[in-house]
Structures are given as C-alpha cells and as structure tokens.
C-alpha cells in the first residue's frame, strides 16, 4: 500500500499505545511499550501489503499526504507522545526502506547500491497483495474496500484514543 496508509496505521497504533503510558510509569515499561509499538508497526506493514491493493496515490500524492499526516499529527498530539508515534511510523516504513530504497535509488538516481534479496515475505510476489497492470473489476472493488476498511479502522482507533491529543473539548455556556 501507499506509505500514507502505512503512516495512518502507525499513527493509530502509536496514539492508542500512548493512552496506555503514564508519566509515572517505570522506564522499563515505557521501553517495552515502545518496542511493542515498533513491532506492531512492522507487522501492520505486512498485513496491509498482504491485502489485495492498488496504489491510489502516485509518488507525489503519497509524499504530500504522508508528510501532511505526520506534520498535522505532530502538531496536535501531546508533545510527550511524539516520540512514540515516530517509533510507530519508523516500524511501519522500515520494511520498505530495507527492501525497496536501494532499488529505487539505483533506478531514479543512478546509484549503484547493492540490491539484496527482499527480507520481508510480503514483498515477494507470492506474499504481496499488490495489484498492477490490468486489474479485474472484482480485484479493483476489493482494493477500494480494503482501503476504506483501513481508513475506517484507523479513524475509529484515533477517535477512541483522542485523549492523547492536545485538543480540548469546547465548553458550553
């Protein structure tokens, strides 16, 4: 899936976990939660890439939407939670960094980085749900449905964990 969807999922993971951390928590507990958040980010990448999907955003749209999500969320989340959200994002994008960045840099910038065998199973043809070329109508519908499910799930998780945000509810009167 586009990086924007991996990032949205990571924000939902990180913000939900942020609600489970208290300032008074032991350092060991905070570190354990951070490690878990990173691993959940990596695992979410596998789940999303395993779903049948097309890429609704080209590279520029993906870059702009991903950057916007991160900038906006860093502005509205409580400052003490920012690192946890960045850890979740790192976990969610590290599979692409490891498996795709050397190839992409070689292709687009003419570098000569070694291109190793893909580490993550969901980046192999048999493990990826990536749809390319001529896509059957049923597969396109499945892709759209999967994107809607991901966005809906993340939106609900972000709403339920909104106490991690700096936003204050309006007071009546």
What are the residue ranges of the model-derived segments?
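N-terminal membrane-targeting hydrophobic helices
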Residues: 1-173
